[in-house]
């Protein structure tokens, strides 16, 4: 009997970064990739995921915080692990929120090894 592959939602608006993520993770995980907060929230409301890889800055806005808040407060799967991917330093006023609500962080740019490492680590803790 085949082992089910973990299902990951990737929320990333940069096409180049999407490609890096797909190449790094597609052999090990089932990926659903979206590039905006509306699609992410819709998928999260109607599907179950084993992990969310979330870009904080979507279309030049801090949409990641909104998505993470909705995951933790409103979704049926509020315990889904979330890894924050960002090229920016966290705002001091947001640091505590992210540390309390995210399960991991990966700075951009990242490589395949680092991305696989954090995803595997967070999924093993699940």
Locate the predicted segments by residue.
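Conserved acidic carboxylate
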Residues: 12
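Two-component/phosphorelay signaling modules centered on CheY-like receiver
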Residues: 15-32, 37
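Active-site residues of response regulator receiver
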Residues: 55-57
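Short amphipathic alpha-helix used as the core "switch/output" element in two-component signaling
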Residues: 63-78
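Alpha4 helix (beta4-alpha4-beta5 surface) of REC/receiver domains from two-component response regulators
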Residues: 66, 89-104, 117
């Amino acid at each position: 009997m085949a082992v089910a592959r973990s299902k990951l939602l990737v929320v990333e608006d940069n096409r180049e970064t999407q490609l890096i993520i797909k190449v790094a993770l597609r052999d090990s995980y089932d990926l659903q990739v979206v590039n905006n907060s509306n699609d992410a929230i819709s998928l999260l409301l109607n599907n179950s995921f084993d992990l969310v890889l979330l870009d904080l800055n979507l279309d030049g806005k801090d949409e990641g915080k909104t998505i993470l808040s909705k995951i933790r407060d409103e979704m049926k799967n509020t315990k889904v692990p979330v890894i924050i991917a960002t090229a920016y330093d966290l705002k001091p006023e947001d640091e505590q929120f992210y540390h309390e609500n995210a399960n991991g962080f990966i700075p951009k740019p990242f490589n395949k090894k680092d991305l696989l490492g954090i995803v595997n680590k967070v999924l093993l803790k699940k």
